């Protein structure tokens, strides 16, 4: 029960290295700087929590954050940006005192905490969360992250959630309920150490944007997307950009009827040798810029239809091993070669 005489606030230690979250009546008695939990500051690039770093001025002095036992009685509805750009933050203690049962917005909560190695999320209640966008963006030092307790049944936005988590080698998302999610854009972007990713439990029936979803996942050797429902997806631009270790990719379940963006979709997939796109309907696609650029091991693209797209500069640039109806010609790399009669496609 929240006592109206109590106040949620954040206290900065005198040496500016410790942030402590309190919910009590003692704010006026504490030495040093304090901010109300809703206090913000405005800079050119946006509005930020008063105690955090900003895009223009990241915080490099805070080393630890602590949730005092008093904070357990507070019920925030947002934790967005609470630790944003605290670049030297190494530990968060007392997370068991943070009750997130009423929190709807966790966007950017740990964004830019590039020194955090672990975060204990076992007590996190995400049952009312709607937005987890950018939640762990640029947490570059995280080597493990247990989100198995997350209830994501009400979440609609998880774009860029793990973007830049370049030290994560594995991620168990088997408990994730994505049935309401509509935006998966950049979700695993820059997760360059991930070697496997099991998304078999993902329900993507409401997803409209999956662009850059696996961008830069350069250590992924396999990726099973057979369970993906792509019937509402409109943008898959850059979806597999830089997945340089993928040796195969089965997209036979992809429904592309609503898609209009495929720019850079496979750019830099330098280990792919064949792609079966015979099920692709690209009639609405208006951007195929650099779609297969740099796929220098790609020998065969199976597709029985002719694709037409005005914005297709360098679509096949660097596909030096590719051969369809005709062998690869470095002077012909746009969508005029996206056909099985006089181009680089092979009939299946």
Where are these regions (language model features)?
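Negatively charged
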Residues: 1-348
């Amino acid at each position: 029960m929240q006592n109206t005489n109590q106040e949620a606030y954040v206290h900065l230690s005198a040496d500016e290295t410790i942030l402590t979250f309190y919910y009590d009546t003692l704010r006026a008695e504490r030495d040093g700087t304090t901010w109300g939990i809703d206090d913000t500051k405005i800079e050119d690039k946006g509005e930020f929590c008063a105690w955090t770093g900003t895009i223009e001025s990241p915080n490099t002095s805070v080393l630890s954050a602590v949730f005092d036992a008093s904070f357990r009685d507070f019920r925030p509805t947002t934790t967005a940006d609470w630790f944003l750009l605290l670049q030297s933050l190494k530990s968060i203690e007392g997370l068991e005192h943070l009750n997130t049962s009423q929190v709807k917005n966790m966007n950017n909560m740990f964004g830019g905490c590039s020194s955090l190695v672990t975060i204990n999320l076992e007590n996190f209640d995400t049952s009312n969360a709607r937005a987890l966008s950018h939640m762990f963006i640029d947490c570059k030092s995280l080597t493990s992250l247990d989100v198995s307790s997350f209830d994501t049944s009400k979440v609609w936005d998880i774009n860029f959630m793990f973007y830049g988590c370049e030290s994560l080698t594995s991620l168990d998302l088997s408990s994730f309920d994505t049935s309401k999610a509509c935006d998966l854009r950049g979700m695993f972007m820059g997760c360059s150490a991930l070697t496997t990713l099991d998304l078999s439990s993902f329900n993507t029936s409401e997803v409209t944007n999956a662009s850059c979803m696996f961008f830069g996942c350069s250590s992924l050797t396999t990726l099973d997307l057979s369970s993906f429902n792509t019937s509402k997806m409109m943008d898959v631009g850059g979806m597999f950009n830089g997945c340089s270790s993928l040796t195969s990719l089965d997209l036979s379940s992809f429904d592309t009827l609503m898609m209009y963006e495929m720019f850079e979709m496979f750019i830099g997939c330098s280990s792919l040798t064949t792609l079966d796109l015979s099920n692709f309907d690209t009639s609405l696609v208006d951007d195929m810029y650099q779609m297969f650029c740099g796929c220098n091991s790609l020998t065969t693209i199976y597709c029985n239809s002719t694709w037409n797209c005005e914005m297709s500069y360098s679509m096949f640039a660097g596909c030096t091993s590719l051969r369809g109806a005709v062998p690869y010609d470095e002077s012909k790399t746009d969508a005029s070669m996206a056909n099985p009669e006089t181009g680089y496609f092979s009939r299946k």
